[in-house]
Amino acid sequence: MAIMRGNVQKTLAGGERHTFRLHLAYSIIEGFILGILALNEFVFIKSLSGSDYELGILFQFSMLVFLLLVFVNEFLKRIRRRRIFLRWVGIITRFPLLLLFFFPRSPEVYQNGASWHMIFLAIFLVYYLAALVINPTINLLLKNNYSHQNFGTLYSYSQSANKVVLLVVTFLYGLLLDADNYAFTYIFPVAGVLGMVSVFLLSKIDYTPPEIIRIKTTFGQSVKNSMQNMYLILKNNRPYLHFEIGFMLYGIAFMTTYAVMTIFFYNALGLNYSSVAFYKNGYNILAILLLPLFGRIMGRLDPRRFAIITYTSLAGYLFFLILTEYLPYFTTIWGLKIYYTLIFYVISHGFFAASMVLLWNIGSAYFGDDHQADIYQSTHLFLTGVRAIFAPLAGIFIYQQLGYT
């Protein structure tokens, strides 16, 4: 990774090099946090005895918050000191993770009352709210500091580093949870502190907003204007509309199956934490190898065509997951239950993970001007929130009525 970083930085202009270093550091720290979050749903149903619908809500929160972007967008436009604001967002949304240190370490407590489940859900609702500010801001910062030809490549390098850290942390965290089912009570506070540090690093990336003369309006009128702007972007930019239609159909499929997959791993396959860590993250080994290649491809290819890789691989890994219920053959290696059909699931998921992280995070930036990158990403994320209203819980309902397959 150090060799890759050195070779990249030799070919970059000063501003790009500074941005790349900060974004790389941010991505590495976020990789640690995401490695912990990779097992969050499984922790919720296994260690905290959460119900199926509560599990669906936990996942739903991570996407549903994007509905608020229509309000947050207008609020952000009124913030002149965005760097300071970004740091406060990091503190306010990451600090509640420290409260998990005080959670009980007894299974009886979680089985006999739902109050701890509600507190857990509330903590992560606050955590996910940060994405309303951070996700569009990342696109804005990078699009205005990276050249068009380097944008996809540099982003893929940072994501490769992110995936390496995520991979290692998830496996180690899975082993730790097998030894101590309540290890989350002291791991999440560490993640909270690191989350504040990562957002601080992100806020150090240079950005000078363009001088725009704005007509003073009420906040309500501004929200209405924001909705109209989203509508006009979709109406007038046909390629972007096609991109979002494809994403809407994909997103419904992804959201309806995500929480059910966790239940399937726990109830149907009887996996321990280490095995779940393998299946939910082993595909990142392939994703790490593919990301630099996919980053270069995305810089040269229409994102709508690039999406074919993502959607096809999603269908592939769901197919092999379904097949496991009919061909439940496995072997045990070092305490890991290796299902033969799930090997192909991991391969398909590797292609999905490598392509989706690029398409979902920066795909929208290719359809507008540099200073519109945050607006396009906000529209993209808002539509994510729209499908999150119904898709995750619909998946739980369908599973309970009809079964896994």
PLM-predicted stretches and their roles:
Residues 2-69, 73-76, 83-87, 99-101, ...:
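Helix-loop boundary and gating motifs at the non-cytosolic
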Residues 90-114, 312-335:
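C-terminal ends and interior cores of transmembrane alpha-helices
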Residues 78-95, 182, 299-314:
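Cytoplasmic membrane-interface "Motif A"-like loop-to-helix N-cap segments
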Residues 21-40, 58-73, 89-93, 118-119, ...:
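Substrate-agnostic recognition of the 12-TM MFS/MFS-like secondary transporter fold
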Residues 51, 80-82, 147, 181-183, ...:
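A helix-boundary/kink motif common to multi-pass secondary transporters
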Residues 16-24, 113-121, 236-244, 335-343:
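Primarily residues marking transmembrane-helix entry/exit sites
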Residues 199-217:
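Helix-loop junctions on the cytosolic side of multi-pass membrane transporters
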Residues 47-48, 78-79, 141-145, 264, ...:
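Helix-to-coil boundary motifs at intracellular loop junctions of multi-pass secondary transporters
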